[in-house]
Each structure stands twice: as structure tokens, then as C-alpha cells.
From Swiss-Prot:
InterPro entries: PsdUridine_synth_cat_dom_sf, PsdUridine_synth_RluA-like_CS, PsdUridine_synth_RsuA/RluA, RluA_PseudoU_synthase, S4_RNA-bd, S4_RNA-bd_sf. SMART domains: S4 (SM00363). Belongs to the pseudouridine synthase RluA family. GO terms for molecular function: pseudouridine synthase activity; RNA binding. This is RNA pseudouridine synthase 2, chloroplastic. Keywords: Chloroplast, Isomerase, Plastid, RNA-binding, Transit peptide. The active site is at residue 235. One of its GO terms (cellular component) is chloroplast. It is found in: Plastid, Chloroplast. The keyword tRNA-binding does not apply. It comes from Oryza sativa subsp. japonica.
Amino acid sequence: MATTAAASPPAIATALSALLRRQRRRSSRCVGASHARCLAADANAEAVAPSRRGGHGGTRLEEAVPAGEGRSRIDAWISARLGGGGVSRARIQASIRAGLVVVNGRPVSKVSHMVKGGDIVSCTVLELQPLRAEPEDIPLDIVYEDDHLLVVNKPAHMVVHPAPGNANGTLVNAILHHCKISTFTCLARNSIDDECPDSSDDDIDVFDIDQFTTGEVSSEVREALVRPGIVHRLDKGTSGLLVVAKDEHSHAQLAEQFKLHTIRRVYISLTCGAPNPNSGRIEVPIARDPNNRIRMIATPGSGHRYARHAASRYKVREVFAGGGSALVEWRLETGRTHQIRAHAKYLGIPLLGDETYGGTKSMALSLLRPRTPSRYHCDLSNMISKIDRPCLHAALLGFKHPHSGKILEFSCPPPDDFTEVLNELHQVTLASNGNSGGGVARICD
């Protein structure tokens, strides 16, 4: 069960230390897409009526690449032609992969296909699809609630908001039921699928519950809003604290605090390896990995076109197995998609269980097994095999109440799957005491 402190809470560091002390005592006892609309024009600026192809609704673009124009990627060329219609590059790429783009009479499927002067391009951009979310009686671990907001301890493996193909079982479905809000239908905003998404792991969203008490809202609002109540997000695999706004004023005030970076956010993670030095600040921009759209990359020097400023502070709380793993605390200055995960990979310490960013089971074992006695290798293998998500938990959250102005801070211990791995690492490390000094747990205060 999550623990809370409101109005006059202990300092975040004190609260986190208390959580860690509890875990140490416990372990010591054990020793022994939605889509957007677009308008298109042909080379003569003549409007083209919407049409359908292959069952997909959309607006067509049919145009010749001007003679003498240099070679261009097909996705970039279409994006330049339709940019005024608010069409994202990601939506164009999805249309290409769906076989809805034809060059000189032949369908193309690669977004990197090159076009040149004289080529005839025919394109049907995927049409916007509505998202519908139903209230669902899903248990919520509510840490705090009043008339204006609630703070929820999100379990790992729960998606925060509905998306095409994933409209049920989300935190939004649970909130709709808890707050007794009827079904709503809305359209996904462009940024969700953009190459450079504005929303992120722990950044602001742009809506609140009140705006979705009915299924009918203006097209302008529907294009901007999609997930009721959620002010910021956590990845599906991340557990921990989220604040949810119940009214427009609360949402606006909380969103402003996120923009001003006055929200206090502390995460804890288990990593593959230990960072050196054991504390520091990372200020490295983050962008979408051009080779893998589900992954972000830290890009020093901001050379990437879509890179966005990102800054994180980290501190090692404990080191296990002579550096085979570590408990690392993170404090976010910005909130980009996968920020902690991308920065951890950049430091060479991917999160334990984060297969997307290199924290694979094989990597974890390659770091831990050589540093622990052989009698614990079987236990280590069993422990690692059970990890099914990145070991990342949003442990502490602090902000100013949007109505009263009081400072609220909340702490929440990590869930069982996280603590089981933490306890196992404690056991292996403490029981290895005397193994050439490499197995002694090192606590960093």
C-alpha cells in the first residue's frame, strides 16, 4: 500500500532513505494510432476530394515531382507537400508502410524510397480514427484524493491511456469508472505519433476530465485532447506515482508546474552495472532512434534534427556484487519520452530488465555471475529470468496544490517484483562478504 504525506511532508531524501532502510532490514533478515485529418492540394493548388483505398479513409495527393528537383526521400517529400495540413511524418510513414503510396504506378513500402523530378506520386494519407474509452471497474491504488485531484500508484504493466488496438484496461478506463464519467469518444492528437513527440514518460498532457463528460466536443478540442485527467505519463512497464486532475483549473495549474520544472519527481531503478562517478547530472538531448521507432537515443551535440533538451540527475544509493548492479535514484529536470531509460543507456548502465535499451538478461548475468560465488549462480539465473519489465519506479512526487497552494509530497514503496529483485541482490551481496571484497554491499549516502 502506498504511503502519503501532505502539506508538511518529510524531505524527499529522508522519505527515500526510509524506504531503503526498510528494504535493507528485510533483506538482512533473509541472509542466511490514432490518425489526424489532412487537406491536400495538387500542383495547381486545386483541392482534391477525399477518397478511399484498401478500406482506409483519407485525403489523396496526386502530384508530379517538379522537373529538375533533386532526389528526396518519399516520406520527406510528401511531408513537405502536406505540412500545411498538420500531417505528421509518422502518419505519412504509416501510410507508406500500409501500401497507400504509389510512385509511377507502383506501390512503395519503404519510407526511404527516393523520388526525383518527373516521378508521379499518388498518396492516400491515413484518415483520423476515433478513440473510444469505456469506464471499467479496475482497482486503483489511490494514494490521495480530494475534490480537485487524485494521486494514483500505477502498477507495472498498466498502460496509462487508450490507443488504437489498446482501448481497454488502461488507467484512463479505471479513472472514468472511479470518477463516474460516461464513455467518451475523441480523436488522437498529432503529437502521439510524431517522430518528435511532445508528451513523454513524465511530461504534461493537455486535457482534463471535465472536458470529456460527454462524447460530443468540437473538432478543434478533439484534435488537441485524448486522455482525460492524466497530467503526465509513465511507461507501461514503470510503476509508481501519477497525479490526475479532476477539473480544468487543476489541470492548467499542474501543467504549468510541469512546464516550470517545479514538480518534484524522484525515481529509483536497478541497473546493469554501476555508474562512475556515483552521482552526477546528465544534460544530453534525446531523439527518436531512426532505426527503431519504439526507442529513443541520447544524442550529444544536438546533431539530430528532432533532438530535444533533456536533463537528469542521478545518485547511486547502493552498489551490489562489486558493481554488477546498483540501486540508482533519478531526479528529472525535464520529462522526455524514455528519458531515464535513454540516459541510463548513455551512461552504460541500462536498467535491469530493459530489453529495449540493452538491459537484457544475458547482460545482467554477465555482470553479476563473475562477481558472486558460484553457489549463488542458480539463484541469480532464476531471479533474472523472472524480470519482465524495466526495474524503474516513480517513488516520490511533490507539487503545489492547484487550489489551496499547499505543498503536497507523496512517497510510495516499490512493488513486490521490484523489491524481490532488490532483496535477492542484497542477499547475494551480503552473503558474499569476504569474497575478495567484491561482494560487500556498498551504501552511498
